[in-house]
Amino acid sequence: MSYENLANLIFPNIDKTPEYYFEKYPKRDLKEGAKVLRYAPSPTGFQHIGGVFASLINERLAHQSGGIFYLRIEDTDQKREVEGAIDDTIKTMHNFGMDFDEGITGENSEKGAYAPYKQSQRADIYRAFVKDLLRKGLAYPCFMTSEELEALREKQIAEKLTPGCYGEFAKYRDLSPEEAIKRIEAGESYVIRMKSPGNPEKRVVAHDMIKGEVSFPENLQDVVIIKGDGLPTYHFAHAIDDTLMRTTHVIRGEEWLSSLPIHLQMFEVLGVEAPKYAHIPTIMKMDGSSKRKLSKRKDPESAVSYYSEKGYPSQSVIEYLLNIINSAFEEWRAENPDADYHDYKVELDKMSKSGALFDLVKLNDVSKDVICKMKPEVVYDLYTNWAKEYDKEMYDLVTSKEAMMKEVFNIDKEGPKPRKDFAKWDEVREKIFYFFDELFDKETANDVELPKTLELEEAKRIIEAYEKAYNFNTDKDTWFSDLKEVAVELGYATDRKKYKKNPEEYKGMVSDVAGAVRAALTHRANTPDLYTIMQIMGEEAVRERI
């Protein structure tokens, strides 16, 4: 009996070798410096902002180097799989401007020469590599029951020892092939563990592309590589997949940093080169005066659906995330206001080593900048696409007056300081409702925002006087001259210096008169340019309201 017999008993139908797969999945023919990266989620839930953050880093590094960005689905834990999670991942990344060069394209479809890209369909590949390790005596079947493992763990903790299956506690590590075969033939359950070559006296030193040099004790654990159900553990599948798919860089959350010694050791035992690693900081948020991890349970903004429902343009979210990835992006954007964000080069060594702080106020500022640069036609299209799903009443109203709405979305946009009225589409209704009688007529007296200097009766007198003077067919300068004439007749100042010098001689400023007109037409104290609003509304609508 030998290791060969043991390997053949465990995997009787596996006739392929690692060499076969190395030939089947050759090195990629890419230019020097091109990076191959992946987004590799587990389909155990719907996408969150941390996933978009990680995916964006991988996508930018791949594509800015002329490389490959692919989607792999890590579905070895099929009990936790959520229906629709794969399609949600693909849709989410597409909506945020990230399309995969290869990999999974749907629940049951994929593209690319390194398929399959779903781990549950790669079982025979993993088995071929495990069979090879068994042949070489580098892995072994472990027959410890869950009860034995729990008892061992309790004993180790009581004795203040590191819990786990290693060294003297690896009960079946040195079991002979003959004895292992007997147990398997007797029907005993088992997992397969890799024999760790780790030395308790040594440390593993590695270069993390974000954190710099990192150092850990070598891994001593004989980690499970094939579970009782025959599927690989994440650790082993990751090593095999990244090797065969020719991944050059693995960018993942810093919660995986402690697993780095295990993964580097696996590549060593497999006899293959490890990819380069970078561990990105956890997304944090301020909670009072302290920081904490962004929570799927506590924080609605952790879910990608939050940004769709609120109506943040995907470009806004991307540009905000680029700010988190590299703080230098903000300066670059200021210097290149009209450039495509793809022109910015993401650099890992300039990324914060500590937690990335997520700030909705900052996101809103970024989003206002993004939207204010959009052409009115683009704003119209994006807004109506959003409203069709999330605000059907506004969708019907806005699309019924398409030409007018494109004018509305262009108010005060073409000057040196364009208005920044909204950060997300759910704010649009409040900003433009007064263009629609259907919404304006629902307002009550309590909704009307008068200038603080005016009482209601005085505002009514102003409107009565202005109604007589109003002329639709004038340019802006003439319109303002007419407004000032009304102001003077009613005792309001048109010169701020004179008003400040003798305020008791006037009821107020011409701005108060304009404020009364604004309130009559819009019910709001703060709107875009009043003359432009009136021209867009049209003479009939204006006269009806004043």
Curated annotation (Swiss-Prot):
Subcellular location as annotated: Cytoplasm
Motif ('KMSKS' region): 293-297
InterPro entries cross-referenced by the UniProt entry: aa-tRNA-synth_I_cd-bd (IPR045462), aa-tRNA-synth_I_codon-bd_sub2 (IPR020751), aa_tRNA-synth_I_cd-bd_sf (IPR008925), Glu-tRNA-ligase_bac/mito (IPR004527), Glu/Gln-tRNA-synth (IPR000924), Glu/Gln-tRNA-synth_Ib_cat-dom (IPR020058), GluQ/Sye (IPR049940), GluRS_core (IPR033910)
EC number(s) per entry: 6.1.1.17
Enzyme class: ligase
SUPFAM superfamilies the UniProt entry points to: An anticodon-binding domain of class I aminoacyl-tRNA synthetases, Nucleotidylyl transferase
Sequence positions that bind ATP: 296
Biological processes annotated in GO: glutamyl-tRNA aminoacylation
Gene3D superfamilies (alphabetical): 1.10.10.350, HUPs
Superkingdom classification of source: Bacteria
Family annotation (Pfam families): Anticodon_2 (PF19269), tRNA-synt_1c (PF00749)
Oxidoreductase as UniProt keyword: no
Record key words, sorted: Aminoacyl-tRNA synthetase, ATP-binding, Cytoplasm, Ligase, Nucleotide-binding, Protein biosynthesis
Catalytic activity reported: tRNA(Glu) + L-glutamate + ATP = L-glutamyl-tRNA(Glu) + AMP + diphosphate
Chain positions of motif 'HIGH' region: 41-51
GO CC terms, sorted: cytosol
One MF annotation (Gene Ontology) recorded for this entry: tRNA binding
Function: Catalyzes the attachment of glutamate to tRNA(Glu) in a two-step reaction: glutamate is first activated by ATP to form Glu-AMP and then transferred to the acceptor end of tRNA(Glu).
Family according to the record: Belongs to the class-I aminoacyl-tRNA synthetase family. Glutamate--tRNA ligase type 1 subfamily.
Record note on quaternary structure: Monomer.
Protein name: Glutamate--tRNA ligase
Provenance organism: Clostridium perfringens (strain 13 / Type A)
Gene giving rise to this polypeptide: gltX
